[in-house]
Swiss-Prot record:
Record has rRNA processing as a keyword: no
PROSITE patterns (alphabetical): LRR
Keyword DNA repair in record: no
Quaternary organization: Component of the CCR4-NOT core complex.
Family annotation (Gene3D superfamilies): Endonuclease/exonuclease/phosphatase (3.60.10.10), Ribonuclease Inhibitor (3.80.10.10)
SUPFAM superfamilies xrefs: DNase I-like (SSF56219), L domain-like (SSF52058)
UniProt name for this protein: Probable CCR4-Not complex 3'-5'-exoribonuclease subunit Ccr4
Organism encoding this protein: Encephalitozoon cuniculi (strain GB-M1) (Microsporidian parasite)
GO cellular component, one term: nucleus
One GO molecular-function entry: poly(A)-specific ribonuclease activity
Cofactor entry: Mg(2+)
Gene this chain is encoded by: CCR4
Residues annotated for Mg(2+) binding in this entry: 221
Catalytic activity: Exonucleolytic cleavage of poly(A) to 5'-AMP
């Protein structure tokens, strides 16, 4: 249903109008003698252009940040004395005109307007250093570099989960973290340059890992050089970790292999030893599988997407085995069919390995780039494969013998997680910790509170080294004499 918004008759001085978003995308209220902006205006979240020039406006309401699709804003020739910090949340802005007002100060939050191409603020009594910075066209850069006035988030705590089985033994803690490849970080121009600096972020990532100090850790977007030159040694020394890494498929073709990122698994050597590892290159599986490699339309759509997964079969001192799978699924929301295909190939590999190790518990972690409403999520958390996201291009594949879904549990299914990935253009849950094989969820790491995200445009920032957050869970492992199966419930539960 189209949004309906009412322009206040009292505030704007004209006849009240009912307007619908499909009718227009801009609003011109220039030279209307307006003194106050009606709050109802900020319910028109569909508008892209707003002209309020040449009026008598003294205050810009902080609710202006609700206009998240606004691209052009003209407030020139008014009596405005200050800019609300909330304007920095309108990251879609491309043109902003605040000329001919009474503005003396600039909020540092303006630095997050990374799409801003035209910024006019002439004929304002700007104080030092803003008057000089605007002349040298360095004002927004200055704001971006000094945008540090927001408070830190609350400490994240372990939240206990009810129903721990009395027959269970000790607990094992696990975590997953997409640490943001340095190549991708440099594209996040809404963040200060010192925030996306590779050494600054590297230390921040290390601090988070050491802080939570889990027994099994899965990392995504970790470059080969970062792994071998830094994380492997540092985490061996600080957390007593052993580790393996598997890079993206492009490592076979690019000359600068050290910058290729991949997935890595770390485990505490005092609690586990490596029995076997299982690298998975989804692209290679597609081009080698007779179900797919004769379908040119499918091959063209898949292209050279080089997403991967890595598995590790770990064994505890008591002989109990754990199959840990870490994956990074394709990112583009326009390709839900490719995401589902990659996950179905992953599901097949998990079943193949699990059939050889039927008593192993299962942990599946990573960045799945998929919401809980997706076929990807449903195919992992239910016993039935959901083919809805295959669409027309790959619908014929739903008839192939993919078998059943995994029917795993989501460690955060009972938590209001809010987000695991937060950028100016997206905020949602796409990272997961799935588990099965008789282990029982004991606790999870608490979410980042929504109140914190209301003050920032996106991650990374000075408090978070990546655009993803660290997820953690603790599991109570069954005593070894209790029968279990990776895809079924414990016999005593």
């Amino acid at each position: 249903m189209a949004e309906e918004c009412l322009v206040s008759r009292k505030k704007f001085g004209g006849k009240a109008m009912e307007v619908r978003s499909e009718m227009w995308t801009g609003l011109d209220l220039c030279s209307q003698g307006i003194k106050n902006i009606s709050k109802s205006l900020f319910d028109m979240r569909f508008i892209r252009t707003l002209n309020l020039a040449n009026n008598e406006i003294e205050v810009i309401p902080r609710e202006i940040c609700n206009l998240r699709h606004l691209e052009v804003l003209n407030l020139s020739k008014n009596k405005i004395r200050s800019i609300p910090p909330e304007i920095g949340k309108i990251v879609s802005l491309r043109e902003l005109n605040l000329s001919d007002n009474l503005i003396s100060n600039i909020p540092m939050e303006m630095g997050t307007l990374y799409n801003l191409e035209v910024f006019e603020i002439a004929n304002n009594p700007l104080i030092v250093p803003f008057n000089t910075l605007i002349r040298d066209k360095k004002l927004l850069q200055f704001c971006r570099e000094h945008n540090t006035g927001y408070p830190p988030p609350n400490d994240r705590l372990w939240i206990e989960c009810t129903g721990k089985n009395v027959f269970y033994g000790d607990t094992v803690s696990v975590g997953t973290f997409n640490i943001l490849s340095n190549i991708y970080a440099t594209r996040m121009t809404y963040a200060p340059s010192w925030v996306i600096n590779s050494e600054f972020r590297r230390e921040g990532v290390l601090q988070e890992i050491v802080l939570y100090n889990v027994d099994i850790l899965c990392l995504q977007e970790i470059e080969l050089y970062s792994f071998f030159d830094f994380y492997k040694e540092q985490l061996e020394m600080r957390c007593n970790y052993d580790s393996i890494i598997y890079p993206r498929g492009r490592v076979k073709s690019v000359p600068d292999k050290k910058n290729v990122d991949g997935c890595a698994i770390f485990w505490r050597r005092s609690k586990f030893r490596l029995i076997a590892q299982f690298p998975i290159d989804f692209h290679q599986k597609v081009i080698q599988d007779t179900r797919f490699n004769t379908n040119q339309e499918l091959l063209d759509r898949y292209g050279k997407k080089d997403n991967i997964a890595i598995g590790a079969l770990l064994e505890r001192p008591n002989g109990q085995q754990v199959l840990v799978m870490n994956t990074h699924i394709f990112w583009d929301p326009d390709y839900p069919d490719i995401k589902l295909l990659q996950v179905l190939l992953l599901v097949e590999e998990i079943k193949r390995v699990s059939s050889r190790h039927p008593n192993a518990c299962l942990l599946l972690q990573g960045d799945f780039n998929s919401l809980r409403s997706s076929s990807v999520y449903k195919s992992i958390t239910t016993p039935v494969i959901d083919f809805a996201d295959f669409g027309d291009t790959m619908q014929h594949l739903s008839n192939q013998q993919f078998g059943d879904g995994l029917g795993l549990n989501d460690a955060y299914s009972n938590q209001d997680l809010g987000f695991t990935n937060f950028t100016p253009g997206f905020k949602g849950v796409i990272d997961y910790i799935f588990y099965g094989g008789g282990i029982s969820l004991a606790s999870v790491l608490s979410p980042v509170e929504d109140e914190y995200t209301e003050n920032v445009a996106g991650l990374p920032n000075m408090h978070f080294p990546s655009d993803h957050i660290f997820l953690g869970a603790k599991f109570a492992f069954p005593n070894k004499n209790i029968s279990q199966n990776a895809f079924g419930r414990n016999s005593r539960q």
